[in-house]
Amino acid sequence: MNQKKICYLTYQSFPAETANSQQTISNIIHLTRNNKDVKLIFPLREKNSSDSIEKIKKVYNFNENFSIQGISHNYPFGKFNIFSKSSFHISHYLWAKKTTKKILSSEEHFDYFITRSDWVFYFLSKNKRSVAFEVHQISKIRKLILFVRRNAPNSKLIFLNELLQKQLHSFTSLQNSTVLHNGVDVSNFANLPKKQKEVVFVGSLKRFNKDRDLRFLIEAFNISELASTHRLKIIGGPQESVEELRDYIQKKYSDLNIEIKGRLSRFDAVENIKSAEIGVLLNEGSNDHSKYYTSPLKYFEYLAGNLKIIASDFPAHKSLPYSKNILFYKDGQTDKLKDALNKSISVKPAEFNKNNISLDTRAKKIITFLET
């Protein structure tokens, strides 16, 4: 019997320092570990885009082999700084239409497709291909496409959390959808070192082109009991934000035990999580995606690393697996974050079933969803 082939066809760019690119690569790695023949196809739309498997392996720190094909991208998005939103939608539509037509008319056969891209989903669904669309947020175009293709029998939807599925239920057919939170490669957390007295934030210092409010975290840490016993460690980029934070700390909190490490490799970031005692999730409260629809990769890494976890009391965070163990604080209220930091001294990390947060389990569920 021939092995079923899966094509992960997406408008994302690789390699990239983004959580969404990490999530896609992680999915593919674990589908591959489950003996699936997977091919990643994406546009070469950024200056640093590359379909070299060795470059991809180095950035995302893995050893598995799978097929990668970068497709040329002769469209405006990424080439100009003006009208970026409009150029994204136009370029996305044109690239998806041309690329899906090319793939479907080629001699290479795929049994299933997975995508995170609206127009890729639309054209594959329209051509009656078996496709699973990973839905991570809401947009007007997405609602329209989901509504138009809601009764397509081979078109399936994977929602990142229950709130997202509920919000889009009137645009979809629920029998063709499922909810799968993000997960973690638990093998990376098999051997945990002795915990250091560290509070850690790991992630991009910007989200949706806005600064994550790291100053808010620093101010709360400064007035907490942990300021005299723990180190606050902030890991992430871009470098411009790193330098701004370092200047801010030098001017206002030079006596505090704070380390701004900037971006680290995947391996080094995981090692820092494993040795920390407390992990903090910060999100932008004015953004609906952050507030309602996210399932942060870092949450699952903190959980697997046996960290005590502090997070803003957003509905998305409250819908996470094992959320009853999270120390919640009111977004934007320094005193409440200080209280959560103080409380973390006396609580224990969450008890959890590794299989429930494993990317391997998630991959198995995706395979079952595709094949039924």
Mark where each language-model region is.
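Short amphipathic alpha-helix
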Residues: 20-32, 217, 298, 366
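A charged, aromatic-enriched C-terminal amphipathic alpha-helix characteristic of glycosyltransferases
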Residues: 187-188, 332, 339-372
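Nucleotide-activated donor-binding/catalytic signature segment of Leloir-type glycosyltransferases, i.e.
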Residues: 236, 244-273
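Carbohydrate-associated surface elements
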Residues: 163, 183
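Conserved donor-binding/catalytic core segment of Leloir-type glycosyltransferases
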Residues: 7-9, 158, 184, 192-222, ...
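Nucleotide-sugar-dependent
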Residues: 19, 208-212, 267-272, 279-301, ...
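N-terminal strand-loop element at the rim of the active site
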Residues: 10-18, 30, 36-91, 121, ...
